[in-house]
Regions:
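Conserved kinase catalytic-core helix
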Residues: 60, 87-125
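The N-lobe alphaC helix and its flanking beta3-alphaC-beta4 segment of protein kinase-like domains
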Residues: 44-60
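ATP-binding glycine-rich loop module of kinase domains
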Residues: 21-47
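An alpha-helical support segment within catalytic cores of ATP-dependent transferases
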Residues: 1-5, 117-166, 170-171, 176, ...
Length: 287
């Protein structure tokens, strides 16, 4: 078994906190950050997956912070990565300067389109459509009719071989000077870009009224919805985005189904997912 360097956390200072974990900096190693995932995500299996994915994405030419090594912090596993100086996520920029919301939506659109046009390594990364096919067999508390509706739509999706992020949202692209970097790549894969866009739609519209979501993204409901409107207009080049919104709503439903591929939902989460799946099917598949 490989020996990993043991880190003394007392020599490090907490630097930031995100959805997956906490980052630390050290005066002794000023050009790197230590990232410790939250409980359940600090196993060697998960951290090595993050490490391997980051290295593979970098080889594709996608702008990401360099990851250097896997380390131990007590019994947990963590990573040492490049410290991107003076960084801010699009979420934080929108929070600090609400007047830039539309501009940041255009930034996400621009860099999203670059990502979606990049050819992925299909020998390393998973097909999002294949993941969806598996997840549709796992999803619970939905009717046979609704499962059939989703399967029929899933069969129409082209299995594209271009990149998708997997957690495409304002917190996962950071700015440093004039440069932008993608972060949190553990769900990276290939497929139709609408998988990523549906995820963004889910956050900015369906989940926007939730206080927990607002806290994560540092934006209130109205600002999240405004971000989506600006993104949709930038992405389509049109003022009337109703058809695009409708398609994104369909993929938002599939994004919830995909949770069964990416995690092991609790009973409460399964019921939460089922409620929103049913609501989205009524609105975007049957409406």
């Amino acid at each position: 078994m490989e020996n990993y360097r043991q880190i003394d956390l007392s020599a490090w200072t907490k630097f930031g906190e995100g959805g997956n974990g906490v980052t630390y900096v050290s005066l002794d190693e000023p050009d790197v950050i230590l990232k410790i995932n939250k409980p359940g995500l600090c196993t060697l299996e998960f951290v090595k997956h993050e490490y391997d994915v980051s290295k593979a994405v970098e080889r594709l030419g996608i702008p990401v912070p360099k990851v250097y090594e896997i380390v131990r912090v007590g019994d947990d596993y963590a990573t040492i990565s490049e410290r991107v100086k003076s960084k801010k996520s699009l979420s934080r920029i929108c929070c600090d300067e609400p007047a830039l919301t539309e501009a940041m939506a255009e930034v996400l659109c621009e860099h999203g389109k670059k990502l979606f046009s990049a050819q992925c390594d299909t020998q390393i990364f998973p097909s999002r459509k294949a993941q969806l096919t598996r997840a549709l067999e796992k999803v619970r508390f939905i009717s046979k009719k609704n499962r059939r509706i989703l399967k029929e739509f899933a069969r129409t999706i082209e299995d594209k071989t271009t990149c998708v992020h997997g957690d495409f949202q304002t917190g996962n692209i950071i700015r440093s000077g004039e440069s932008y970097f993608w972060i949190d790549l553990d769900r990276f894969g290939y497929g139709d870009p609408m998988f990523d866009i549906g995820h963004l739609f889910l956050i900015c519209n369906v989940y926007a009224p939730m206080k927990q979501v607002q806290d994560i993204f540092h934006m209130g409901e109205a600002q999240l919805r405004s971000f989506w409107v600006a993104f949709a207009r930038a992405y389509t080049g049109e003022e009337d985005c109703s058809a695009f919104d409708h398609l994104a709503g369909k993929f938002a439903c599939l994004d919830i189904v995909l949770r069964y591929e990416f995690q092991k939902p609790s009973l409460a989460e399964k019921l939460f997912f089922a409620f929103h799946i049913s609501h989205l099917i009524k609105r975007y598949y049957l409406g």
